[in-house]
Amino acid sequence: MKKLQLINLIVIISFLFISCESLKTATFDQHSYQKATEIKVMSSQLMDQATYPYNDYEKEVTNLLSELDKIVEYEKNKPYNDISLEMWKILSDKERNLLAGFLKRWKEQNKMSEVFVEQAKSQVIEAIDLIINYEANKSKESKD
């Protein structure tokens, strides 16, 4: 009977350990935070130019898309970082309506209306702010 109780206790402790492991969040990463703020500024400045011909800013667009690819690769290799990684993937997905999708449409249409740019920009900036805030809050969580 004591052996059965010990086995049950071990099983319960194992399940608790496994469930706690799945709730882990990556710790604060200064590089991730800094890159997110840099990408926010770059995105804001570049999106403001979308009322002009795409060809005039093709180099800057390529550079920004490269920065997105780099941060996705960086975030992919951090343990317990699924949420941040998914947020970056959504932002960099050319088939969605955030940053990479906006840049793709700019290339296809050559110029965007000022109204569209402002609306799209507010959504992109809000999405990047969510990433920045999530990363900043990791610092508080990891201290607890």
State where each predicted segment sits.
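C-terminal amphipathic alpha-helix
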Residues: 98-144
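Post-signal peptide N-terminal segment of mature Sec-exported envelope proteins
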Residues: 27-49
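Long, amphipathic, charge-rich alpha-helical segments that form helical bundles/coiled-coils
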Residues: 68, 75-117
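C-terminal motif of bacterial Sec signal peptides marking the signal peptidase cleavage site
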Residues: 16-19
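Alpha-helical segments in soluble extracytoplasmic regions
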Residues: 48-86
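A structural signal for well-ordered alpha-helices, especially hydrophobic packing surfaces
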Residues: 40-43, 47, 68-75, 96-103, ...
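Bacterial N-terminal signal peptides that target proteins for export
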Residues: 1-8
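Bacterial signal peptide processing site
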Residues: 21-24
